[in-house]
């Protein structure tokens, strides 16, 4: 099946697929079963039953679109306006359907010699009148899902086809077409000169050279504000001498998901061209064993000068991230730092495969990130970044820090505190996507859209939207507005409400006093 590339304003020869809800005037013989399609081929039309209209929102539209693209048995042209509900405006329909269909229709890396027959049916969009706002939403959705698929494709590629050197070269070549991006690849000698010994310690067991890829976008050169994204890029994680059991080693090609995500974000940023400064750092190596691989109990000096005792070579992710965070804070002059990594197994235990675990150094930066996730329709959950979790990071008798402790049962929390040690007090977000980066052997490109929105600092504003502001789930359906304005508006509303309550209390008090005097 081909990807969606345009919205058509006239009918084509495909069957027109319309949404129908509970209580709507239904044609005869309509099958009223959730997501069931009933076809009336003489009229060249079909209806999909979607239950209660009041309950059909963005998530339902997205999941329907994904399922339709995966199981499409006929070519359909979707009548987009029929899917609009009080929870979902036309922009939300366009956004959800574009992302859902192109997610499922994407042809990722595959070396199978015998594959099932390619679905030759097609899906297309029909919207008689397209406003510029709707067209902008459509174009943005295409860019975001393309970036998401880019990250997914890198993730699914096997480790013998995508080592550290190959991944860096792919980024270098692929990003040449974006003239507003500056790509710099650091090789071993440059990494050594910078004193990134934590990355080099992980790379000691590899037959491939480490790479640090720096991607910079300057959308506002006059501003000192800069968001720096850091992605873990372990192209395969055997655990090193702290060797993983075989069943836990499968799927470790996805341990580079963090780097794939931040690269995909920069791909989208280059096309969306926000008036912001955003950079990304990919720290790339594999973690394997040879005669010179890092041994448990070894001590290394980080770029920051802090020494680290490596108690567990399978806790390598925090080592490669630490040097990159410090680089982002001190060399790239970040004013906001954010990293993403498939970091800890305890995060999978804590939140499963539903929510990505998020750590934030302040409520302000957390709310900025949470707003971005809401716009992107991705599930995030704030985790505790508390000094109590840092105690076991400082148990070493021979170094400033240790990278792992058997005395701490919530390793996702201690790992976050370990990384915070290298942020140079820059406002910081840490995203542990160990449970959400991939599912059933397939990469999801998780948080790509959230990171893009976070980098753009986009906020919701439904003032001129045709949907019900209180019920609309589209989130990004209108004009961008700064966090400051929204916070001020909320505070102003709260202040007015408080004043109103106070006035009411005073009035009530006077009334009570008058009644009291009357009794007397």
Swiss-Prot record:
Q: Which organism is it from?
A: Metamycoplasma salivarium (Mycoplasma salivarium)
Protein known as? Probable cytosol aminopeptidase
Which amino acid positions bind Mn(2+) 2, per UniProt?
A: 232, 237, 255, 316
Q: What class of enzyme is it?
A: hydrolase
Sorted alphabetically, which HAMAP family does this protein's record hold?
A: Cytosol_peptidase_M17
The UniProt annotation places Mn(2+) 1 binding at: 237, 314, 316
Asked if the record carries the keyword Metal-binding, the reply is yes
What InterPro entries is this protein classified in? Leucine_aapep/pepB (IPR011356), Macro_dom-like (IPR043472), Peptidase_M17_C (IPR000819), Peptidase_M17_leu_NH2_pept (IPR023042)
Could you say which EC number(s) this protein's record lists? 3.4.11.1, 3.4.11.10
């Amino acid at each position: 099946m081909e990807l969606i590339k345009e919205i058509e304003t006239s009918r084509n020869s495909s069957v027109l697929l319309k949404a129908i809800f509970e209580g709507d005037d239904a044609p005869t013989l309509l099958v009223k079963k959730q997501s069931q399609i009933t076809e009336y081929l003489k009229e060249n039309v079909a209806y999909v039953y979607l239950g209660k209209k009041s309950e059909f929102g963005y998530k339902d539209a997205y999941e329907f679109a994904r399922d339709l693209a995966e199981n499409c048995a006929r070519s359909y042209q979707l009548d987009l306006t029929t899917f609009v509900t009080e929870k979902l405006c036309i922009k939300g329909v366009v956004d959800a359907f574009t992302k859902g269909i192109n997610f499922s229709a994407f042809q990722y890396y595959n070396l199978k010699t015998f594959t099932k027959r390619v679905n030759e049916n097609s899906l297309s969009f029909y919207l008689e009148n397209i406003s510029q706002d709707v067209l902008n939403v459509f174009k943005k959705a295409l860019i975001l899902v393309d970036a998401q698929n880019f990250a997914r494709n890198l993730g699914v590629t096997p480790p013998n086809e995508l080592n550290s050197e190959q991944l860096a070269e792919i980024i270098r070549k692929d990003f040449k077409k974006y003239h507003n991006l500056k790509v710099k690849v650091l090789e071993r000698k440059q990494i050594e000169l910078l004193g990134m010994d934590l990355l080099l310690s992980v790379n000691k067991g590899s037959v491939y050279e480490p790479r640090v890829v720096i991607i910079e976008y300057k959308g506002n050169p006059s501003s000192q504000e800069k968001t720096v994204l850091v992605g873990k890029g372990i192209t395969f994680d055997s655990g090193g001498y702290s060797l993983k059991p075989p069943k836990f080693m499968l799927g470790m090609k996805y341990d580079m998901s963090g780097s794939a995500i931040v690269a995909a974000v920069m791909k989208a940023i280059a096309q969306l061209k926000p008036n912001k400064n955003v950079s990304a750092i990919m720290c790339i190596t594999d973690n394997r064993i040879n005669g010179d691989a890092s041994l448990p109990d070894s001590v290394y000096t980080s770029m920051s000068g802090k020494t680290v005792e490596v108690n567990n070579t399978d806790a390598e992710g925090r080592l490669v991230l630490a040097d990159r965070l410090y680089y982002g804070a001190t060399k790239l002059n970040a004013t906001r730092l954010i990293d993403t990594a498939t970091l800890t197994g305890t995060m999978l235990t804590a939140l499963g495969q539903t929510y990505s675990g998020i750590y934030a150094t302040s409520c302000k930066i957390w709310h900025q990130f949470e707003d971005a996730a809401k716009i992107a329709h991705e599930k995030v959950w704030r985790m505790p970044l508390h000094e109590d979790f840092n105690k076991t990071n400082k148990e070493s008798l021979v170094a400033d820090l240790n990278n792992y402790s058997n005395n701490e049962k919530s390793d996702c929390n201690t790992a976050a505190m370990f990384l915070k040690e290298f942020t140079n007090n820059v406002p910081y977000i840490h995203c542990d996507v160990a449970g959400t980066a991939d599912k059933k052997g397939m990469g999801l490109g998780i948080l790509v859209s959230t990171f893009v929105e976070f980098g753009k600092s986009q906020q919701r504003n439904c003032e001129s939207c045709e949907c019900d502001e209180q019920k609309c789930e589209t989130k990004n359906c209108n004009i961008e507005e700064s966090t400051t304005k929204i916070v001020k508006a909320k505070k102003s509303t709260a202040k007015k409400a408080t004043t109103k309550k106070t006035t009411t209390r005073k009035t009530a008090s006077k009334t009570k006093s008058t009644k009291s005097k009357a009794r007397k």
